[in-house]
């Protein structure tokens, strides 16, 4: 147990140090209240497939922006629920809301890129915001985004939303996965013009139109499941100015409402985020378990075998560092402190989802999402 306890502590110190330094480089976007010098025309492009639960609230929040010069284009991606009925009814009431009944999915495309490509074809804006139908926007979001783009002379702004956790399973699994994604994103590198590392969040991809056209738009990522990350990579490879930032003050999301939705939603792409590498996925699964689960096990084992007090103390120090980091994550995500004790279970479930995603990708050679199957 001495070697295990020592290794465990050094591993925890390494992870805590990396996460702490990484967060220093996280840029946060805050609301802009003053008037802008100019209000360039914005086209907000929203793909919607079976989004009857959320689409009305999302579109209403977009239409209620304190920005005077924009349009909202919603493309129904062949939904089999009431999504098209809801949006088309709203479009009759708002002149700046355009509803498009999307074409059947074309060969060589995945659903979301194809829907956004159709929205782009109808767009008139100097700026293009590609977003999702399950978001809720604050009224200052567009004004703040334009202000940020202009002041920082950006070609692409991509933002992370605030996250809403409803059910028990959301509070168990989602914080662990969001923390995991944040740990994969080296904020210093992705915001460095001299480094090729890139990150994109499909919930908020805000382009200058000419920059979007320069990289070939969504046509250039037509068959990608992780189209948001890939289009951000293309932007950086083409020398565009890209900013990845925290946009919690601008918009929020409740991604999934049940364990089944969480499982199916992350299974489709979490292994792809590992670049389909078994080694990479195994490494990160081990790191997640060693950080969030094994500190409890090491403490209990040291107490069980009657280890010397110094080793019990070292194992407790490791657990304390893990808990402190977990409390920081709870604060960042707006969760109650007691939620930190759910993270070990969340780590186990995240690993199970990763393994399921791995098997689906490597053995079945396919990805499934919203009733569609994409062959790998």
What do the PLM-derived regions correspond to, one by one?
Residues 1-38, 175, 350:
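N-terminal membrane-anchoring/stem segments of glycan-assembly enzymes
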Residues 25-32, 51-64:
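Short, well-formed alpha-helical segments that are part of the catalytic scaffolds
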Residues 40-43, 71:
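Cell-envelope/extracellular polymer assembly enzymes that use nucleotide-activated donors
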Residues 59-105:
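Acidic donor-binding segment of Leloir-type glycosyltransferases
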Residues 82, 131-148:
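Acidic donor-binding/catalytic loop of UDP-sugar-dependent glycosyltransferases
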Residues 98-118, 144, 148-206, 210-214, ...:
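Long helical/loop segments within the catalytic core of UDP-sugar-dependent glycosyltransferases
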Residues 149, 156-181, 210-213, 218-281, ...:
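Catalytic donor/gating beta->alpha subdomain of glycosyltransferases that bind UDP-sugars
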Residues 283-364:
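Membrane-embedded multi-pass helical conduit in multi-pass membrane proteins
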């Amino acid at each position: 147990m001495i070697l295990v306890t020592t290794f465990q502590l050094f591993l925890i110190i390494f992870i805590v140090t990396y996460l702490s330094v990484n967060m220093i480089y996280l840029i946060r976007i805050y609301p802009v209240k003053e008037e802008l010098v100019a209000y360039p025309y914005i086209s907000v492009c929203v793909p919607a497939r079976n989004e009857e639960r959320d689409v009305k609230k999302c579109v209403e929040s977009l239409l209620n922006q304190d920005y005077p010069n924009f349009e909202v284009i919603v493309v129904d991606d062949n939904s089999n629920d009431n999504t098209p009925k809801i949006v088309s009814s709203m479009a009759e009431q708002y002149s700046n809301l355009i509803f498009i009944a999307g074409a059947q999915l074309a060969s060589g495309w995945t659903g979301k890129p194809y829907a956004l490509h159709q929205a782009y074809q109808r767009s008139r804006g100097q700026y293009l915001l590609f977003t999702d139908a399950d978001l809720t926007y604050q009224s200052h979001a567009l004004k703040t985004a334009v202000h940020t783009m202009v002041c920082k002379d950006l070609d692409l702004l991509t933002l992370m939303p605030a996250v809403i956790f409803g059910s028990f399973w959301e509070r168990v699994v989602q914080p662990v996965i969001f923390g995991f994604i944040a740990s994969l994103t080296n904020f210093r590198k992705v915001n460095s013009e001299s480094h090729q590392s890139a990150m994109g969040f499909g919930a908020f991809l805000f382009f200058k139109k000419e920059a979007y056209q320069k990289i070939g738009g969504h046509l250039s990522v037509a068959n990608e499941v992780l189209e948001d990350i890939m289009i951000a990579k293309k932007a950086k490879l083409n020398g565009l100015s890209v900013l990845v930032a925290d946009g919690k003050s601008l918009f929020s999301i409740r991604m999934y409402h049940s364990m089944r939705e969480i499982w199916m939603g992350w299974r489709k792409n979490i292994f792809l985020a590992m670049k389909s590498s078994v080694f990479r996925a195994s490494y990160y699964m081990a790191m997640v378990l060693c950080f969030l689960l094994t500190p409890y096990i090491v403490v209990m084992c040291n107490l069980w075998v009657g280890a010397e007090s110094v080793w019990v103390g070292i194992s407790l120090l490791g657990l304390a560092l893990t808990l402190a980091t977990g409390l920081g994550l709870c604060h960042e995500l707006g969760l109650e402190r007691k939620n930190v004790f759910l993270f070990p279970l969340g780590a186990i479930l995240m690993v199970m989802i990763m393994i399921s995603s791995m098997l689906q990708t490597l053995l079945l050679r396919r990805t499934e999402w919203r009733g569609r199957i994409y062959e790998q």
